[in-house]
Structures are given as C-alpha cells and as structure tokens.
Regions:
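Extended acidic low-complexity intrinsically disordered segments
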Residues: 1-179, 223
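N-terminal "pre-motor" subdomain/linker immediately upstream of P-loop NTPase catalytic cores
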Residues: 101-106, 111, 134, 196-306
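RNA-contacting regions in translation and RNA-metabolism proteins
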Residues: 157-185, 217, 228-229, 303-306, ...
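N-terminal intrinsically disordered, low-complexity tails of helicases
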Residues: 166-192, 239, 292-298, 307-312
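Flexible glycine-/small-residue-rich
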Residues: 217, 236-238, 246-248, 280, ...
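P-loop NTP-binding catalytic core
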Residues: 270-272, 281-356
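P-loop NTPase catalytic core
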Residues: 361-363, 369-599
C-alpha cells in the first residue's frame, strides 16, 4: 500500500492511500488517517459506487487524495465553476444537480463542491448510511411551478454577468458601438439572399446549410465586436435566469434562444411574457449559446418607461361596457346568422369571460372560427389569439386556414407538460399587453382539456375529487380563465373558452361544474338541436350574459326582454327554430327587434 504524508493537514499526520475497484469496475479511493477522526459524511456514502474518506485541515478545507499517488489536494470552498470553463454543460436538466456523481465533476476529475464547500454525496440526497439527513441540510428543492429547468449549463455562473457593474464592463469589452446585426433578419433571408451571403463568406450554399451559414455569419459579427440584436418573448427559468423564445418554436428554447442573466432581469424588472429587444453576443469563440448583455426595448418602449408599467394584479377590473357587434363582421351568410343570434341571446363585450358549453358535434369549431373572423373585422386594434389544447392536428390546420388570428396549438400527441407551458406562456403574453393598455381576445378550445393537462402534471396532493381530479389541479385553469377582465381606463382581456359536456367522462362534468359560475357570459349548445340539424344549435333559454344592461342600448334592452318572455314557454327546439325563421326575414337585428311588437 503506497504511503504519503499529509503536507497540508495539522501536525503532519500520516495518511494511507489505497485505490481499489468496486463491483461495477469503477475506481475509488480509500483515504484513512492514522490519527484524528475521519469526516463522517465522507467516510461512508449511501447508494454509492465506492467509498471515500477525508479529513479537514486547520482552515476547515476538505483534504482529499487524487487518483494515483501524490499529496492530498485541498479543494476550494467557493461554490462556483472553475474560471477556465464557465460554460460547461452539465447535461440535461438544471446545471447544478447536487446528487449525480458523474455530472458533478470538473474536467480534472475532481468533484464540484456543493453549497457550503462540501462534496456532494453519491446517494443523491445527502443522506448518511443510516438514512439520516445531515443537520441543517435537506433535499434540493425542485424548480418553481410552471418554469422549465435551465438548458444552458454553467453559463449562468459566468463572472461577467453576476452584477450590474460586471455587465456594464462586459458591454464595453464585447461591443464596439457599431450598428447591431439583427438576428431575425438573418434568419428570414430568402434563398437568393442566403446565396449572396454564402458567397461573401466563401461558403458553399445549399438549403440544408442554412443553419451553418447563419451561425458563421453571427460568429463573424461577434468576432468583430458587433452586437447581435435579438427580439422575442421572455421565458423565465427555474434558476432565476431567462431566455428568449418565439411562437414559431411554440415558445420552446431553440438553438438561437439568447440567455438572459438574472442580473439583467432584476435591473429592469422584467416579467415573463414581455417582448424584448436584446443586444447579445457569444461569450467565447466556440460557445454554443448567445448571451444578452444589453436591453434596448421592452414591449416597444424604452426600458426606463416600461419599468413604470403597473402589474396586472394591480389593475382594477370591471364588467364589460364596450360591446362587440359580431353581426357587422360576418363574412358568410351562415356565420352571419349564427352571430346575429349570439348578439341577441348573449352579447359579448371587450373583457368578457365567456364559457361556451358544448357537447360533442354541436358546431363549436365553426362557431369559434366565426367569432375570430368577426372580432378581427369589427375591432382591428384587438389582437385575436386562438389557443388549441390537446386538439387534432387536422383541426389545427383548419383553424389556421379559416380563422383570422394567430393560432397557438398543442396537439393531442404531445405531452401534458407541453400543453401547460404553452397555455401559461400565452396568458402571460396577454397580461403583459393588457398592462400596456392593449386589447387581447383569446379563443380557447378547450378549458376542459387544459384542466386535464394540469391534473396530469400537478404533484398529487392526496385530495382527490369526484372523477379522479386532484383538488389542486384546477387552480391553474382558473387562474387562466380568471385573467379575463375589463380594466378601468386601460386595456381588456377577453377569453371565450369551450367546456366539454356529455362526453361520458365524470371528470369532464366535474370540471364544467367548477367553472360554471366563474364566467360572466354563458352560451349553451344543445345536442338535440344538432341531431335535428338545426344550426346554430344554441339553447336560447339557458344562454345569457351577466350585466347585459351595460352592453345593450336602453331601447334595445326592452325589446330583448320582450323577446325573452315570448320564448319562455317553448322548448329549446321550438324557440330556436322560431328565432331562426324570424331572423332570416330581416337583414339586421335592429330590424328584427322592431318587428317584435307587430307579432
């Protein structure tokens, strides 16, 4: 057994070093002191592939022998990455996982010290042999709810982005003041323009080489100290940092998603879902990711002005007061008939929180497309978004072709986690725009499937409701749906969501009952009417809007009450059939209401 002296320890104690191999063939060291007790947390490890021993010197540093023969090395106490490689990728998941042994080694084979200077345990949870947790420590907490783990490895520990002063110095070092190169312009170049760019860079051009050509162009700009301007939506990560994402990638981090350090986020009070324009660069010549060092715009405004925007929860909500006359925006005769009846039965205003109760095959898809086209026509200043969750792929294609508005979709062959992340990003983007005084309309299909996705990804609370849904699973969908509101003196967020009923699933019925009283407008579709091929299959008696007097003209309201009293004694089929026949005889709803007193 080779022997060596502890030159860094106390009193020159003699330590013995032995290298052996475990059952899995991996080499491990046994470090034993001839005097003084060994550190109990490093003497034996649970769930490990080997055993190690150690002791501490007079300054409290851990003494550990390297592989092979030699003197004991003193590992640093700092909880940081080595200065020569601050961008090492720790593999999938969060960059600093304290339990994985192989993912916590530096290039030289040394283990990365955990917080407080201790080496991480191979068992993964810091427990000793008896299963007792080390005093004052516990399992590493998981990521914040709704936030993804960082895919950027150790980039967040780069010393040049750890403080505002360091960030200012980094901008002076990496940027020369020349006009920035726009990332989106390079990515959107046509084939001919890409061929010209390839010739200027002395590269061969083929369509399959577009990513390599874009990368070479950006790296040359970075080498010349030219900033790379990138515009996108801010996504926050579980470690407090962020990145830019785009709708074309369904808000998933891509190869060109710039890293946004937490220092920049805190300095300007950035929020998830904000539209940013950043100045970025490659931190090193062969670094895989862009890193943001400067901020030019937030939601199209100066960063200083954007920081004064109040948060969404601080805004004062009120009932909708500005009506959307859908009949004026109808493009087809069939859509016009449906929209005229909706205007009569359950009017919609800016800031409405509406629930469309729809059994299967009752025409909800056609109705949503009609809503999108009409709202886009009557209110061009409103942004119309269509959010499809757990939907069929062909249905997504049909919406993109037939409806006016931006479509965000997550199809049924994707994971529930993807459904939840997409929905949360869309609602955060909508909130940021409402804070700026803009109008946003979200058509959601469906809130039932969104609640199912939340039920699948939420940790089990142990409290199960009827139908198998967790008691905490509906908090996320309620937060989404409850964001719809009319802001006094500001913007509006309108959400019209479909709720599935009569599907044969008890869970779907429970979800509908939970959302039944949360909206201020309800439009019920009738399966019996659809089976008789009576469209629109709207149940007139069970549909309506709260505070409808704020949307109707007083003269119009009295005629609406007269119409309501006339259909009270009729069943659903008779009421809607009579309404359809009377509406078809007139060209506008005003003309229809004027004929009511004539019988």
């Amino acid at each position: 057994m080779p022997m060596f002296e502890d030159s860094e320890g106390d009193g020159g104690a003699v330590l013995s070093f032995d290298e052996r191999r475990g059952d899995d063939g991996e080499a491990y060291q046994s470090l034993n002191g001839t005097d003084g007790p060994a550190d109990e947390n490093h003497g034996r490890e649970e769930g490990g592939r080997g055993r190690g021993g150690g002791r501490r010197g007079p300054d409290g540093a851990i003494l550990r022998a390297p592989r092979g023969r030699g003197k004991v090395q003193v590992l640093p106490e700092e909880n940081s990455l080595p200065p020569d490689d601050p961008f090492a990728d720790d593999g999938p998941g969060e960059g600093r996982s304290g339990g994985q042994n192989r993912g916590n080694r530096f290039r030289g084979g040394q283990q990365r010290p955990a917080p407080g200077g201790r080496l991480p345990q191979r068992g993964g949870n810091g427990a000793a042999r008896g299963g007792a947790m080390e005093p004052g420590r516990g399992p590493r907490p998981g990521p914040a709810a709704g936030l993804r783990r960082s895919p950027y490895g150790g980039l967040g520990f780069w010393e040049k982005i750890q403080s505002e002063a360091a960030l200012d110095a980094a901008r002076a070092e990496f940027f020369s003041g020349a006009t920035p190169m726009d990332l989106q312009e390079i990515q959107n170049l046509s084939g001919e323009q890409m061929a010209e760019l390839a010739a200027s860079l002395e590269m061969d051009w083929e369509p399959s080489l577009r990513p390599q050509l874009v990368e070479n162009c950006l790296r040359r700009a970075a080498e010349g100290r030219t900033a790379i301007a990138a515009s996108g939506t801010l996504e926050l990560l579980s470690d407090g940092n962020g990145c830019l994402v785009w709708a074309r990638d369904r808000f998933e981090p891509s190869q060109w998603s710039p890293f946004v350090p937490r220092c920049l986020i805190r300095r300007h009070g950035l929020r998830r879902g904000q539209e940013l324009r950043l100045l970025t660069t490659f931190p090193r010549a062969n670094g895989p990711h862009l890193c943001a060092l400067g901020l030019e715009q937030v939601m199209g405004q100066n960063p200083g002005e954007a920081a004064k925007i109040p948060q969404f929860k601080e805004l004062i909500p009120y009932y909708p007061t500005e009506r959307l006359l859908l009949e004026n925006g109808a493009e087809e005769a069939g859509q016009r008939l449906s929209l005229r009846i909706v205007d009569l039965v359950s009017p919609i205003g800016l800031g409405q929180r509406g629930l469309i109760v729809a059994p299967p095959r009752t025409g909800k898809t056609v109705l949503l497309q009609a809503f999108a086209n009409a709202i886009a026509a009557v209110r061009p200043d409103a942004q119309v978004w269509i959010l499809l969750i757990d939907e069929r792929p062909e249905e997504v294609t049909d919406f993109r072709r037939m409806a006016r508005g931006e479509v965000f979709a997550s199809t049924f062959d994707e994971t529930p986690d993807r459904h939840v992340r997409l929905a949360e990003m869309v609602i955060e983007m909508a909130r940021r725009r409402v804070e700026c005084g803009q109008h946003v309309v979200i058509l959601l299909d469906s809130i039932t499937r969104l609640a199912r996705a939340y039920n699948a990804v939420m940790p089990a609370s142990g409290r199960i409701m009827s139908g198998g849904i967790d008691a905490n699973a509906l908090q996320g969908p309620k937060s989404f749906f409850g964001s719809a509101r009319n802001i006094e003196g500001g913007g509006t967020l309108t959400i019209l969501a479909t709720a599935l009923v009569e599907t044969g699933s008890r869970m779907d019925d429970v979800i509908f009952e939970e959302f039944k009283g949360t909206g201020n407008m309800e439009l019920q579709l009738d399966r019996d009417l659809a089976d008789r091929r009576i469209y629109p299959a709207i149940n007139v008696a069970r549909s309506g809007t709260r505070k409808e007097e704020l949307l109707y003209h007083p003269d119009e309201l009295s005629r609406i009450y007269l119409f309501r009293r006339a259909v009270v004694g009729l069943n659903s089929a008779e009421a809607v059939d009579m309404l359809i026949q009377r509406v078809k005889k007139t060209s506008t709803n005003v003309e229809f209401l004027m004929t009511l007193n004539r019988g």
